[in-house]
Amino acid sequence: MSEDFYCDQVLSGKTPVGKVLETENVLAFHHTRPFWPVHIVVIPKIHVGSLLTLDDNELLIELIEVVKKIAATVVEEHGAARVLTNLGEYQDSKHLHFHVNAGDQIRG
């Protein structure tokens, strides 16, 4: 698998996803192989390696606004939510992405 699943598969349209919310620069969708009963991924539509390499403050604000909107909906519907991003060796796909999830982990 490529180092950037999100550009190579999701944004290219090769892997269809269930869109949750989309803006001009950000896409939120249901994870293709969820770890939690509710598992939504939020990504920028351009390649950004990680949170540490994001230099565009406007894009960062747009990403956080989408994460906040998704998280608020998850909390409203499920009573709680987690928001996380991985860095370094914890980051499987080298494309900045946030996970918004709820419930007990269903796979490891």
What are the roles of these predicted feature ranges?
Residues 1-108:
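HIT superfamily nucleotide-processing domains
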